[in-house]
Amino acid sequence: MIEADRIISGQAKVDEDVIDRAIRPKLLADYVGQPQVREQMDIFIKAAKLRQDALDHLLIFGPPGLGKTTLANIVANEMGVNIRTTSGPVLEKAGDLAAMLTNLEPHDVLFIDEIHRLSPAIEEVLYPAMEDYQLDIMIGEGPAARSIKLDLPPFTLVGATTRAGSLTSPLRDRFGIVQRLEFYSVEDLTSIVARSADCLNLELEQQAAFEVARRSRGTPRIANRLLRRVRDYADVRNGGIISINVAKQALSMLDVDDAGFDYLDRKLLSAVIERFDGGPVGLDNLAAAIGEERDTIEDVLEPYLIQQGFLQRTPRGRIATSQTYRHFGLQKLSD
């Protein structure tokens, strides 16, 4: 199964971009959850505006769907500047990055998603740009080639990544602010679902908002996606009114269980229990057993399962916890 095809995938889908922009908070005052990040960014932004400086370069990391792009746009809005958006895989040539940098206005935000996927050549261009607001460009080729320096306006680079550990030390060290986004509480997600319902003019009961939230794996993007699918169900089956029973029926139809697990989650946990006697099992063996890439397990499936206490990562491999056995109605054998 392709990760992006899952209803509970934290990754963005192409057709969601327009709707997501419509319901995305624009300012910190509307930003729900991540209280420590919100408080710190409020201070940093106000201080930069008081000094009339560009905000320090900002690195945002965490699992997919937690609002890294949203936070980058909020930073630009709060600073009252423009934001230019790109991603690591798109920046193939130094000239691509140079063109973006030279078109920035003072204090503008350059947002690079998936920044861990930048090539070494692009990183070399970024170092002086981030540190000294200078751009080194090579003119000509061969023996006649020469380097010229261009001054850049003070700007803020906002980098987003799901794999902070994959960043090179020289690049990571150039970020003055580093923020980690955590999975959201059910209470915060309930508020997000209710806010999104208001933006979409939906008739949503509070209990239904909670039901969607608790199955959303701590991830706003998943919560909003499930809300839209529940809306479809309600439009067809209940005159557009999203009650608690309608929400439960719709989510059951979507094969999202009470813990927010889908078939792939249950397949992974079942494999650990049934094929490997609860573990420990190595990542490569587990990937082979369920027919998925090890990166998919490590970056997409595991974070939520570990955070929720269903899977334990040890030096010897992955282990199913007692909570996993209870979820499947099984009794864990004593060692």
Swiss-Prot record:
CDD domains: AAA. It is found in: Cytoplasm. It is an enzyme of class 3 (hydrolase). Mg(2+) binds at residue 69. GO terms for biological process: DNA recombination; DNA repair. Its EC number is 3.6.4.-. Keywords: ATP-binding, Cytoplasm, DNA damage, DNA recombination, DNA repair, DNA-binding, Hydrolase, Nucleotide-binding. It catalyses: ATP + H2O = ADP + phosphate + H(+). Residues 258-335 are annotated as: Head domain (RuvB-H). Its main location: cytoplasm. DNA binds at residues 294, 313, 318. Residues 4-184 are annotated as: Large ATPase domain (RuvB-L). ATP binds at residues 23-24, 65, 68-70, 131-133, 174, 184, 221. SUPFAM superfamilies: P-loop containing nucleoside triphosphate hydrolases, Winged helix' DNA-binding domain. Has 3 domains, the large (RuvB-L) and small ATPase (RuvB-S) domains and the C-terminal head (RuvB-H) domain. The head domain binds DNA, while the ATPase domains jointly bind ATP, ADP or are empty depending on the state of the subunit in the translocation cycle. During a single DNA translocation step the structure of each domain remains the same, but their relative positions change. Belongs to the RuvB family. Homohexamer. Forms an RuvA(8)-RuvB(12)-Holliday junction (HJ) complex. HJ DNA is sandwiched between 2 RuvA tetramers; dsDNA enters through RuvA and exits via RuvB. An RuvB hexamer assembles on each DNA strand where it exits the tetramer. Each RuvB hexamer is contacted by two RuvA subunits (via domain III) on 2 adjacent RuvB subunits; this complex drives branch migration. In the full resolvosome a probable DNA-RuvA(4)-RuvB(12)-RuvC(2) complex forms which resolves the HJ. The RuvA-RuvB-RuvC complex processes Holliday junction (HJ) DNA during genetic recombination and DNA repair, while the RuvA-RuvB complex plays an important role in the rescue of blocked DNA replication forks via replication fork reversal (RFR). RuvA specifically binds to HJ cruciform DNA, conferring on it an open structure. The RuvB hexamer acts as an ATP-dependent pump, pulling dsDNA into and through the RuvAB complex. RuvB forms 2 homohexamers on either side of HJ DNA bound by 1 or 2 RuvA tetramers; 4 subunits per hexamer contact DNA at a time. NCBIfam families: PRK00080.1, ruvB. This is Holliday junction branch migration complex subunit RuvB. It comes from Haemophilus influenzae (strain 86-028NP). The gene is ruvB.
